[in-house]
Amino acid sequence: MTVTRNGCRIFPKLHYEVHGLVADKCYSMVFHIAAQFKEPKFICHPAGIKMGALWTSRTISFEDFFITTNPQPTDNSMIHLPPHCKFTPILDVYEVVLDHMQQPATMHRVSSCRLPYTFMTVTMYKNREARVLKLGMNPHARHFLKNNTNKNHLDTASLIPPIPSVQPLPLFPLPQNSMSYTFSYDTYPSNIHVAPIQLPFPFPAVLSTLASSLQLCRDGDPEEIDEEIDIMN
């Protein structure tokens, strides 16, 4: 996945469905990235604390967050990841207990969803077919294709998965002292299930295309070959 100093949206889009929550209990969705050599930055869903009935009735989206090479991002929606860094998005579901003032007192993690893939940040795609394929599947990056259509032609329409529509949740931000919660990590209830709606790519077709491209450059520059291997992660 490409990363710049100005920030790139995380792709594939982070859309989730949650099942098995208790309808009248409060929950919060917390997202972070597990990355090499980096302490995770935890980001609460902007909808804040909601009842289980609401979370299970809507699509949960974390698509409005960005990764950046800037080590000191000023925007809370930015997550710093250096180039050539392996990472995996993770969504945790916390049950929230409110005090007598209806303020959060404790948070207890009840479920977690880790994508079954490891990604790697790169500053560019050197292989033409891989570049057009990846950009063609990312709606946030398709404007790059307009300047490269003639010299980087590749039909990717059949490989682009449908992007589900998302019904936004009403905003209810967490209080400023939300980071003072007490977190616990006991065994998850077996009835709660979190799953991504859209898997990253139709991987068999994509990997087959990338493997063919890699075979053509095996005798090329070693650094370029390394870069192409990064794309597959």
Swiss-Prot record:
Gene3D superfamilies in alphabetical order: Transcription factor, T-box
Keyword Ribosomal protein listed: no
InterPro entries recorded: p53-like_TF_DNA-bd_sf (IPR008967), T-box_DNA-bd (IPR046360), T-box_sf (IPR036960)
Coiled coil: none
Stored SMART domains: TBOX (SM00425)
Keyword tags: DNA-binding, Nucleus, Transcription, Transcription regulation
GO biological process: cell fate specification; positive regulation of DNA-templated transcription; regulation of transcription by RNA polymerase II
Cellular location(s): Nucleus
GO molecular function: DNA-binding transcription factor activity, RNA polymerase II-specific; RNA polymerase II cis-regulatory region sequence-specific DNA binding
DNA-binding feature ranges: 1-146
Pfam families: T-box (PF00907)
GO cellular component annotations of the record: chromatin; nucleus
Protein name: Putative T-box protein 41
Organism name: Caenorhabditis elegans
Gene from which the chain derives: tbx-41
